[in-house]
Amino acid sequence: MIRIDEIWLSTQPMDMRAGMDTTMAQVVRAFGYIKPHCAYLFCNKRGHRMKVLVHDGLGIWLCVRRLEQGKFHWAQVHQGESMAISPEQLQALIQGLPWQRIGRQQVVTML
């Protein structure tokens, strides 16, 4: 099992032809560094392919996922930003499900 303490999602689309070194460079451009035990997620422009780069403390893993139908529900934040997501949100995201509200506490702000 690969230990993952933090999961970071980038809003910048990535060319899925990129190999290990190009993906690592994209992570450094988007996040500033590659931390051990962190996963960095990127999606292509069409939204049906995802790359995940993980530093396990000893080396780098590069995983690719493609949806046969539909698209990933990617973050709707400003271009160039990134955000942290939870493991539960990641599970929904990789299945192509809406994940943005998973794990949020339902807080009443007005009566």
Model-derived segments and spans:
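Polybasic/polar functional segments that serve as interface/processing modules
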Residues: 1-111
